């Protein structure tokens, strides 16, 4: 077997088994070789004793036979033979006893050796099993080693590949870094050019607005001059005497002369506002309604052309007027080319602003029970989402889907500021009470505080959720979010003062005139009033048909805080009584699509609602 396995094709495990068997044969043969040889000698002695015993037995029989056949005189000799035989028998008996004793000892030794051999055989069998197990383990380990060698080779190849890829990526990174640096430089150059072009475009828009303003003023002066040339008949009454408050009442003729001087002096003045006031007072009792209408319209245009916004003084005593729920729709108009998202009255109630998906803010004069288009504010690159006037009505702030907020002056339609910095669409922007700062909330889950003096963002607060609407007090900003929470922020510390969680996504917020109650609308189709002093929900409004149409559906308090108004998804306008919590009135025929926003004039005389279908409706109780 060993000779057959010495060739180069013989497996290593066969050689190992052959060597182990030869080693075991040597070790066990040396241990038992002497014992086996002694056992053989004892067997030979036993056989010899048997032969001797047989021989002696034969001799005994022969002696007896001879003794029986021998004659009498030989008796002495027979006695001697008998004695010899007895002695030999005793001797042989002793030898036989000793042999039996040795045989017993040898048998015991053989038994013990057999036991040892059996034990050794068991040990050999156990060792063979261990050897087989070890051989199997060795084979498994060799297989595992081979697998590990293969894996090591694969890892080395992969490592080499990764090194090559790393070198290639490093080269690519260096090239991209150079490209990025070059692109950054190009971008800076493009931004500079873009800013210059934007400045030129703004200057062009401002120039066009300036031309429009000059044309309007020239047309107004021409109309006023024509109106002043027309012959008029009037009596000396209180209106004429108003122009002569500084003249001495010496008589009718002196008064008439003073009046003539006053009129000529006013006609010679270049100030359009003073001339307009004089003409309006003079023709207050005119019999020409068309002239009166032109004069009135001209007066409105002239007043709205000043930054001080005399629109605020158009409705004296409006705050003392009792607010009533509108009774009917008095005027319907197409506000924009597409969806209308926002609507707001100016502080004087005479000017209405609407914002839509056509990227424009449109201004409307509310004259009687009509809305007349006055102009539009351009510059936004996406749909308008929110509109806000400052407290004087001179500036208009609009948030847009192009990640920016913009400020225009109302009198000349000029774009004054563009506030960029959000990374998502801006859903709400509001003036703080000082009108020098602005807060904007965006879909990027941040709120930003802007300083209009420095035209920069001075604070950014991460709210953690998309902001849908904002309202402000002196030192607190309240924001409504997509995660169903209303957060109260301290402007000075940028910290959340408290949170109020509702059952649906917040779509709109509004404050009552005393700023003690917070109105909120959510996507669970509930409108709630929260008492800011008690930090608890005070009143909940709902209706069987009311359903919030979108995440930016706006709700509003009435100017005196007695009523709440909101539009539904199916186009119904609702009015609730704050004290009773019940529906005061509802209108369902004017809108054919979801109402997005509602505005209540500060004078309390009009309400405007706008919807997704580009329609605006003017409501009144007259």
UniProtKB/Swiss-Prot annotation:
Annotated segments matching region FIP200-binding:
230-242
Protein's UniProt keywords contain Lipid biosynthesis: no
Renumbered residue ranges of the record's region WIPI2-binding: 207-230
User: Coiled coil: which residue ranges?
Assistant: 93-230
Q: How does it sit in the membrane?
A: Peripheral membrane protein
Please describe what this protein does.
Plays an essential role in autophagy: interacts with ATG12-ATG5 to mediate the conjugation of phosphatidylethanolamine (PE) to LC3 (MAP1LC3A, MAP1LC3B or MAP1LC3C), to produce a membrane-bound activated form of LC3 named LC3-II. Thereby, controls the elongation of the nascent autophagosomal membrane.
Q: State what protein this is by name.
A: Autophagy-related protein 16
- The protein's organism comes out as Xenopus tropicalis (Western clawed frog)
Query: What would be the name of the gene that encodes this protein?
Result: atg16
